[in-house]
Amino acid sequence: MTGRNDWPSQLAGPKSVNKSFFYPSVGGSVVLSELMPNLNKDYLSYMKVRGSWASVGNPFSRYAANPHFPWIANDGRWSQLTDYPMYDLKPERTNSWELGLSMRFLKNFNLDVTYYSAKTMNQTFNPDLPVSGFSKIYIQTGAVRNSGVELSLGYNNTWNGFTWDTGFTFSTNKNKILTLANDAIN
């Protein structure tokens, strides 16, 4: 179990509403084969189930909530603000969970299966604005779900000093856009 609170400089503007973000995680596993004393080790020598959940944050780009006016030395002036300042931006947030199973069986085989799912929200981008005095505005929209399965099957054996170790893997991943701002497709 973990917990962390970040105070990144991107959120530190004088008018920023969200100056920090907290993200926790928790994970656990149980070795089921240790809980079964009568287990025939020739058939199933090891079995573990595991699970975890985490929520992580990622700040948006610099100066989105804390506008700056760089000095243009060769012109001897401050630059104009071209991005509309936003003060209530939230960090990008990803909530994810994972379930897995690890096994060793028939003396020489091993299997590992994992299912995962992650949802990312508050994705920040800055589309062009129509004529308004500003050229861009930061908006937070968009949610994406990323989920999939990972599977590996292995075999290991030794005969008279010769070792054979092989493995096969399979994975599938699906990304789905859950929400987008209206007319935000490029």
Model regions: which residues?
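Extracellular/periplasmic, surface-exposed regions of secreted and cell-surface proteins
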Residues: M1-N186
